[in-house]
A protein has these predicted regions:
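Flexible beta-edge/linker motif
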Residues: 35-50, 185-187
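Short connector loops/turns at beta-strand edges and beta->alpha or beta->beta junctions
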Residues: 149-153
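Soluble, acidic/polar mature domains that operate outside membranes
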Residues: 52-63
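Cytosolic ligand/metal-binding cores
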Residues: 162
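Extended non-catalytic domains of envelope/secretory-pathway proteins
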Residues: 156-158
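Solvent-exposed beta-strand/coil patches in large extracellular/periplasmic or lumenal scaffold regions
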Residues: 1-32, 63-147, 168-262
């Protein structure tokens, strides 16, 4: 087994061969099945059929511990010599979590790394992203813009082990965010941007206690319309049904504001 990047790569075979305009590297093993085309005058292309990367799991000697993340020494990262890269991963597992399909086109210009056509598709939700990371000493900043959507919010959240009181609702979120620091270390006090959220028909659960849930079920405009359609689900249940929710929120220096949630 090969120890690299904080992980043991088992039954690994790596083959390198010249190609028409560069070099082709094929890697196959228990944790990876991938091909890398190192093209001479074009972005490198990484086609990954399967990747399981979980750094920190491999056992190491106490005197030489392995960092749990390759980003632990992020303050030393330099883009000098980095190639532009087109990433296509059909099935990716990262830090023990299945993410599914991951795509992205990465370009380097000076101290700036740009992401275009970013995509994470778990099968339950699709996250699209474009952005940039400026890695200038003393002026490091990140910006991301894109969308997140899926047909069922609680199923999409449950895929990552997260529970939500919103059930059976489709969701669409458009985001435009920026902050100081690298992408994986957002500084809360410098987080700014806009979130636009749209939820389809669904239900709030766990509203059975107190009078607030009863009042919502009785006076909600959506609930009144459903009663006109002879739909009395929320009258006899403990949840609160809604036909849609729309919200625009803006973040200023880490504080979320909204005044139009409907």
């Amino acid at each position: 087994a090969l120890s690299l990047g904080g992980q043991q790569w088992n039954n690994l075979s790596v083959v390198s061969a010249p190609s028409l305009n560069g070099t082709k590297i094929e890697a196959q093993g228990r944790e990876v099945n991938a091909t890398l085309l190192m093209r001479n005058h074009a972005p490198w292309l990484a086609n990954i059929k399967y990747l399981y990367y979980n750094p920190g799991v491999a056992k190491t000697h106490a005197s030489s511990p392995t960092p749990t993340s390759p980003l632990a020494s992020a303050n030393t990262i330099s883009f000098r010599g980095w190639p532009d890269l087109q990433l296509r991963c059909e099935e990716c597992w990262l830090w023990g979590q299945k993410y599914g399909r991951i795509d992205g086109d990465f370009a380097i210009k000076g101290n700036t790394l740009t992401l275009a056509n970013g995509l994470i598709d778990t099968g339950f939700a699709r996250l699209k992203a474009n952005g940039e990371w400026v890695n200038a000493p003393g002026n490091e900043r990140t910006s991301l813009k894109g969308s997140l959507h899926g047909s069922n919010l609680d199923t999409a959240a449950g895929f990552f082990g997260i529970s939500t009181p919103i059930q059976n609702a489709s969701f669409n979120v458009d985001y435009d965010l920026h902050w100081r620091n690298p992408p994986w270390q957002p500084e809360e006090a410098t987080l700014n941007g806009i979130l636009r959220t749209r939820l389809g028909k669904g239900e709030f659960t766990d509203l059975s206690s107190g009078h607030a849930g009863q009042l919502l079920r009785l006076l909600s405009f959506d609930a009144l319309l459903r009663k006109l359609r002879f739909d009395f689900r929320d009258t006899f249940s403990e949840g609160f049904y809604f036909d849609s929710i729309h919200s625009t929120a803006w973040i200023k220096d880490g504080v979320l504001h909204t005044d139009d949630t409907l």
